[in-house]
Amino acid sequence: MKNAVHFGAGNIGRGFIGKLLADANVSVTFADVDAPLVDQLSHRQEYKVKVVGSECQIDTVTHVTAVNSASEEVIDRIVQTDLVTTAVGPNVLDIIAKTIAQGIAKRFAAGNLAPLNIIACENMVRGTTHLKGEVYKHLDASLHAQVDELVGFVDSAVDRIVPPAEAANDDPLEVTVESFSEWIVDEQQFKGEVPSIAGMEKTHNLMAFVERKLFTLNTGHCITAYLGCLQGHRTIREAIENPAICDQVKQAMMESGEVLIRRYGFDREMHQAYIEKILARFANPFLVDEVDRVGRQPIRKLGMNDRLIKPLLGTIEFGTANQHLLKGIAAALKYQNDSDPQAVELQRSLQQVGVKKTLAKYTSLAEDSVEVAKIETLYNQL
């Protein structure tokens, strides 16, 4: 594999997926709507990534360029590329679907019948399958059979903490990332040869890893943020270094972990080690990750398929403990941030209709359920 088009030249695109591809000697073309960013990348064709773990190292990523994702140029790149990846955020997938569809149609018209694989690297379950549905809406029906044959829509699970760039840094392209990274793809969805990229793991059981990440990293991260906000902590590291918060977050991850162990057969000791590794990642002294960034969009995070309610539903399914998950949900309801429209809407709903009706509206939990009653009690105690 020689070429990739990557939609989204933000911190995750540059610091995670783009870096892994470039490190594997793939020529990466970033596609983004941020004109100054595109200009910088296409002019310099390299950028620095600060990788922080137990120590700090700076890597230079080369063999990259960039085009505007609203231009004809990105369509022409899709005509010739071997791989398309995205890190744009779930809401933007629907917007870029039309561009990808135009690229596929033009690719076939130009006679390029080599297999093309597309991997959405987003914080959502089966994000590429969702993207596929949107792409097909923009494709002529006469092309569907050919796309089915030649274009692989490959679902993935991604995990790497990439906080916003430090304001003090005068290099707009430099990005800071943690040393830990996990990119797991569904091997069965590729068309043609499955690419070999260091750092991209292949599996036949993707959903187990999607839920492991959602129920552990994402669940723990947002509960750390919401409890941290209540205690006046500014960063995730400050919050997790509070022993009471750390214990609460660990217990919540163990409750969600019990669901994973029963559902997918994860080894109990190995999963416990995974939880400990995540707690250590939250305490990384080199990562300045603000609780407001991690806690933002609380309504989305309270959705039935997201990081708080989905593990809770699993504990109900298996009849297992969930007290700490319930407390995490109560803490999410307390989240206040005047610059976050979802936080404002959530607080307005709580004031107007109360806890039970707000939970029923946003989480799909039944208003008269035992869980909602417990969350209301915990909410009033926080």
From Swiss-Prot:
NAD(+) binds at residues 4-15. Keywords: NAD, Oxidoreductase. This is Mannitol-1-phosphate 5-dehydrogenase. It catalyses: D-mannitol 1-phosphate + NAD(+) = beta-D-fructose 6-phosphate + NADH + H(+). Belongs to the mannitol dehydrogenase family. HAMAP family: Mannitol_dehydrog. PROSITE patterns: MANNITOL_DHGENASE. GO terms for biological process: mannitol catabolic process. It is an enzyme of class 1 (oxidoreductase).
